[in-house]
């Protein structure tokens, strides 16, 4: 029997210390990784619920195990809320991750060795959009499109590649693209070559849910997303569609279970249901509007300080800063900012002269800082501090600038905690 006073702190102090240290790191560091966000206490409560004990292979009303009546309620809640949130008529909430959601889509609609056309990872795409090191580039014949020197998708280039390679599927979506994707144009190209249009909206799902970024649902045959990132929920995946094709829906359903996964994570599905309810609240739209405002405000500071922003701006939650002109590496910038308690990630830029583990840029995103309460004035100050650190790399005053910046970071983090005591 489990007793009420059982806890990790007493039983496993080494693990508990790691958890406590991570909590302190999140509270005392400014999080600017574009794919990270803070889940609400309600989401975390659902993740820690007794549903973690429940096996529920199958779908609501069609389970292979008994005792699933409450799991059915939870999963149906998540499905119905996601449909309402995104305007979908098909939803699968079972994928354990975005990558597994993507694998299920490929498995449902195309065959091994079929050709897919996706965005190059080095130009802002994702591993699962056809990168050679990913299953998507090993199982399928992947052809890649990129962005122009100005940092924009060249739709005529996408069209020409599609006409040449005749893909069975065109993959749209990104992990590091800061502009609006023309979903209608991508569908037009897909229709011209008889391909499915598959959109991975993982990075902008929260913005789309709030109506501050165009939705791909009216254009794509199928859409996937993660449920963290801008959505701000638990780590997991989601498949949606509004194409109206029941045959596609059946294929997607069986491609998740039993083809790619066994039992769903009911506790995570419960957390997804909470996340979707939160995203339907009026204040959620204000939050997402502020995410974009904050990203735009930071961009202007970097440009004023002489740093190149890829595509010269942003229309979403993220942007890339290139250091090619400064001769600085993304790895060095990432490390220096990290010393000042500012967390970013190094990122390749178009035509990057550096290797992927070094890079010539960083990716910056505003979902997490906005969720903890940063306003435009706060992120403008923050961007200035970041430029101070970057300007000082290799100079005599570098350590002093790091120390001064870290003190400012600790002060604002104390004033704007993630989880209020």
From Swiss-Prot:
Q: What are its E.C. numbers?
A: 2.1.2.1
Which InterPro entries does the protein's record reference?
A: PyrdxlP-dep_Trfase, PyrdxlP-dep_Trfase_major, PyrdxlP-dep_Trfase_small, Ser_HO-MeTrfase, Ser_HO-MeTrfase-like, Ser_HO-MeTrfase_PLP_BS, SHMT-like_dom
Sites where the protein binds (6S)-5,6,7,8-tetrahydrofolate = 121, 125-127
Q: Which cofactors, if any, are listed as required? A: pyridoxal 5'-phosphate
**What's the domain of life for this entry?**
Bacteria
ATP-binding keyword on record: no
The primary site where this protein sits is: cytoplasm
Entry keywords, A to Z: Amino-acid biosynthesis, Cytoplasm, One-carbon metabolism, Pyridoxal phosphate, Transferase
Entry's Gene Ontology cellular component terms: cytosol
Q: Which Pfam family is one of this chain's hits?
A: SHMT
Q: Where found in the cell?
A: Cytoplasm
PROSITE patterns of this UniProt entry? SHMT (PS00096)
Site, Plays an important role in substrate specificity: residue positions: 228
Q: What class of enzyme is it?
A: transferase
GO term, biological process aspect, one = tetrahydrofolate interconversion
Q: Which reaction does it catalyse?
A: (6R)-5,10-methylene-5,6,7,8-tetrahydrofolate + glycine + H2O = (6S)-5,6,7,8-tetrahydrofolate + L-serine
Instruction: Mark the residues carrying the PTM N6-(pyridoxal phosphate)lysine.
Output: 229
Q: Name one GO molecular function term.
A: pyridoxal phosphate binding
Assembly mode: Homodimer.
Q: Known PANTHER family for this protein?
A: SERINE HYDROXYMETHYLTRANSFERASE (PTHR11680:SF50)
Q: Which family does the record assign?
A: Belongs to the SHMT family.
Q: What does this protein do?
A: Catalyzes the reversible interconversion of serine and glycine with tetrahydrofolate (THF) serving as the one-carbon carrier. This reaction serves as the major source of one-carbon groups required for the biosynthesis of purines, thymidylate, methionine, and other important biomolecules. Also exhibits THF-independent aldolase activity toward beta-hydroxyamino acids, producing glycine and aldehydes, via a retro-aldol mechanism.
The name under which this protein is listed is Serine hydroxymethyltransferase
Lineage runs: Bacteria, Pseudomonadati, Pseudomonadota, Gammaproteobacteria, Pasteurellales
